[in-house]
Amino acid sequence: MKNQTNQPSPAVIMQIGSGFWASKILLAAVNFELFTHLARKESMSAREIKDLLKLNCTDRHLFDFLDALFCFGFLKRDGFLETAQYSNSLDTGTFLDKEKTSYMGGMLEMMNNRLYGFWGNLEEGLKTGLVQNEAKNGGEPIFESLYKDPKLLKGFVNAMTGIQIGNFMALAQKFDFSKYKTFLDVGGSAGILSTMVAKYNSNMSCTTFDLPAVEAMANETIQKFEVSAQVKAVSGDFFTDSFPKADVITMGNILHDWNEENKLMLMQKAYDALPDGGVFIAIESVIDNERKQNVFGLMMSLNMLIETADGFDYTFDDFNKWAKQIGFKSTSSLGLTGPTSAVIAYK
């Protein structure tokens, strides 16, 4: 986002500097489940929304809130102030209605409930190099605490599902799985990627591999999408256990959680579990090699500072270097949706 003129302007500075205002307006609407309520009723007046959500602000401030969502394109509006009827836009009706399988609000819920506050400590994170999440004040590291707290774990799993489901669908359709028979998703969480691969590729036998705490969620996903004949959930620890053998092995938003040493260790374990001709695929917000376009990838990498201290997102050149170091024959990249890509290593 740059000033395209030769004249100085504060516009972009103020747009970014006040960006947390816009962010919090959307996050509050998601937290209120506003878009889900609107999907049920098709349209509502401000008064109906105020009563349903039990809001005690002035009518004027409620109009400000709803009309800001309208200006952002998240709501449609027919009428004005007291006469206005509000309804979902195409995007929010598709992706922020909790009753649709396309719901991606889990990530926004986690941003609102956890990350919004933690990012207030970005300066401290940059100064100290230390995590700024629950572990900051003597708590356990993020993944240890997640898997011990069912409520926190469910929120995290829903967040990861929300941010990746579109990318998983894209990979399942864009990558040529016709040459392969078996598929393993390491750190598979709720099993969405394995489910999508099975749904779009009847030739594939899929395994979602993660800690025992998420096996029930994965089985629930498998049943929901009616792919139990093709997909199974297997419990294991990708740090301490060998990976099950498979023709294609994936990791979705896994490598970026760790430092380079652990990234290489995980890629080596994938290499060892693949046959000759097998494929390893990492799905991430891969940063462009020149580090000047994928700003979301850069922000995601800073989020790793907040959450893990030494995890980081990376470029395709980084991935290519690591893959060759391990022994993969070649690499390629496949764009998915938005800022996310699949980086692929062939054994």
Each model region followed by its residue ranges:
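Alpha-helical subdomain
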Residues: 1-77, 91, 177-178, 182-347
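Conserved Class I S-adenosyl-L-methionine-dependent methyltransferase catalytic core
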Residues: 2-4, 10-40, 48, 52, ...
